[in-house]
């Protein structure tokens, strides 16, 4: 907020790490440092669990386009990670992240793609039960709805039955205990 109010040309965030890594260093200890990343790419990585800086903390800096430099107080010579409005995509993927704790509702219906409002019907069942969806990959006759396990709770079977009833599907099934893996980049 201060960086924006003072029209700063750069905001430095000093922390205990040298910036963002291409993947979780607890899983891949030799993960390379990301030298430059966009605000949007940062938000994707933060959503998936990267915790160097909270994605909402950058909002005041996005509109004026103030770059953020994540630096390490224990290694001040390290250049860290620059978070910028846009970047040249030297490498298309800048990071890979994962989050566990998801379920997938798998829906199959012949000619689903020709039925106006089909996805809306399925999503309305979730909305009526207070459940957000995280992701929704689709095919011609299939749709998968990814939801958080904690939001689904013990209502999985009831949700499956409601979708079957409302959408008149060939089949609906539920897969629990899944993780989302995201590649982030341009």
Q: In which residue ranges do the predicted regions lie?
A:
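C-terminal catalytic "cap/lid" subdomain
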Residues: 1-186
């Amino acid at each position: 907020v201060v960086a924006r109010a003072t029209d700063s040309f750069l905001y430095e965030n000093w922390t205990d790490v040298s910036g963002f890594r291409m993947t979780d260093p607890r899983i891949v200890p030799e993960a390379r440092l990301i030298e430059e990343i966009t605000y949007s790419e940062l938000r994707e990585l933060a959503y998936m669990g990267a915790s160097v800086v909270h994605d909402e903390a950058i909002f005041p800096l996005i509109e004026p386009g103030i770059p953020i430099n994540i630096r390490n107080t224990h290694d001040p010579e390290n250049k860290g990670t620059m978070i910028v409005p846009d970047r040249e995509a030297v490498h298309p993927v800048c990071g890979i992240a994962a989050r566990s704790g998801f379920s997938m509702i798998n829906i199959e219906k012949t000619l689903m793609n020709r039925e106006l409002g089909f996805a809306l019907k399925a999503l309305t069942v979730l909305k009526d039960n207070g459940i957000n969806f995280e992701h929704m990959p689709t095919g011609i006759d299939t749709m998968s709805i990814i939801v958080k396990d904690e939001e689904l709770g013990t209502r999985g079977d009831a949700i499956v039955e409601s979708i079957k009833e409302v959408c008149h599907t060939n089949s609906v099934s539920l897969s629990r205990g899944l993780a989302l893996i995201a590649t982030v980049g341009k």
